[in-house]
C-alpha cells in the first residue's frame, strides 16, 4: 500500500498532466507494489481536487468490460472513473484534440438513472428498473500515463483513461428496445474501422451498471438519480488525430458525428 503522501503526490502529478495535456511516467514503474486499492485512492484524491476547483460531477464511466480486455490486463472485473460536466459534448461537436493525450474513440451506450441505485445485491433487473433511458455515446479516451507497459493500476489512477463523451440524440427506455442488439459501426473519414454489438459488454450493456452499484456499496456510496453511466465499449479503441471526422451508426438508436480540430 502506498502512503497517503505518495497518493497525494501522484494525484497532483495527474492533475497537472490533465491541466497541461501531458503524460507522466508509469506509476507501476516507480511503485511496483502499488495495488488496485492504491489506484482508486489516487483517483479519489484527484477527483476531490477537481470538485474543489469547481468542476461538477455528472456521472461515472465503466471500463474494461470485455473478457478480452480483462484477460489482457490480468483482472477479473471492470474498472470505473468519474465524469465532469465540462467533458460532455453533443453530436456534431468539434472537439479540440490538444485537450487530450493519446486520443482514442470507443463505441458505447450511456444510461441516465431515474432513481438511486445501491448494492450490495444489485442485479441486472434492478439496474434496468433504475434506468430512465439509454442514449448512444462515444467515449474519448485520454491517457496521462505512458502507454507502454501500463497496467490496471496505472489506468484506474488516471481516472480509467476517461477524457470526454459525445452523446447522441435518440433516447430509448429499456423496455422499448433489446439493448443487447444495438449495433455500432464506427467510421473515420468515411472508412469503416470498427464494428460491434452492445451484448459484447458483459452480455448486456446494463450489467455494468449493476456491477458499479455493488462496487460503490463496498466504498460506502451509491449511484444517484440523474447520474449518467457510460457503460463500456463494444468495439476496440480507434485512434484519432486533428482533422479526423468520426461517424458512428447505432442502427435504431441513430448516429453520432464529431470532428477533431
Where are the model-predicted features located?
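Short, intrinsically disordered/low-complexity patches at protein termini
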Residues: 94-95, 217-219, 247-248
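A conserved acidic, glycine/proline-rich C-terminal tail/linker
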Residues: 209-237
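Low-complexity, intrinsically disordered Gly/Pro/Thr-rich segments
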Residues: 232-236, 240-248
Amino acid at each position: 500500500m502506498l502512503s497517503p503522501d505518495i497518493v497525494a503526490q501522484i494525484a497532483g502529478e495527474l492533475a497537472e498532466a490533465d491541466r497541461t495535456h501531458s503524460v507522466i511516467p508509469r506509476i507501476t514503474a516507480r511503485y511496483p507494489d502499488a495495488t488496485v486499492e492504491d489506484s482508486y485512492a489516487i483517483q479519489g484524491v484527484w477527483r476531490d481536487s477537481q470538485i474543489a476547483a469547481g468542476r461538477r460531477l455528472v456521472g461515472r464511466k465503466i471500463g474494461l468490460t470485455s473478457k478480452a480486455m480483462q484477460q489482457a490486463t490480468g483482472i477479473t472485473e471492470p474498472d470505473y472513473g468519474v465524469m465532469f460536466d465540462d467533458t460532455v459534448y453533443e453530436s456534431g461537436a468539434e472537439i479540440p484534440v490538444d485537450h487530450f493525450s493519446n486520443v482514442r474513440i470507443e463505441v458505447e451506450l450511456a444510461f441516465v438513472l431515474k432513481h438511486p441505485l445501491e448494492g450490495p445485491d444489485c442485479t441486472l433487473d434492478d439496474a434496468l428498473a433504475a434506468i430512465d433511458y439509454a442514449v448512444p455515446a462515444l467515449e474519448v479516451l485520454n491517457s496521462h500515463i505512458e502507454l507502454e507497459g501500463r497496467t490496471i493500476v496505472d489506468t484506474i489512477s488516471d481516472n480509467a483513461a476517461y477524457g470526454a463523451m459525445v452523446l447522441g440524440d435518440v433516447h430509448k427506455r429499456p423496455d422499448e428496445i433489446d439493448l443487447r442488439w444495438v449495433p455500432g459501426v464506427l467510421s473515420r473519414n468515411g472508412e469503416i474501422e470498427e464494428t460491434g454489438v452492445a451484448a459484447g459488454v458483459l452480455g448486456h450493456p446494463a450489467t455494468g451498471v449493476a456491477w458499479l452499484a455493488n462496487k460503490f456499496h463496498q466504498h460506502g456510496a451509491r449511484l444517484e438519480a440523474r447520474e449518467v453511466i457510460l457503460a463500456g465499449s463494444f468495439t476496440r479503441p480507434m485512434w484519432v488525430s486533428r482533422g479526423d471526422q468520426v461517424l458512428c451508426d447505432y442502427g435504431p438508436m441513430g448516429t453520432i458525428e464529431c470532428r477533431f480540430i
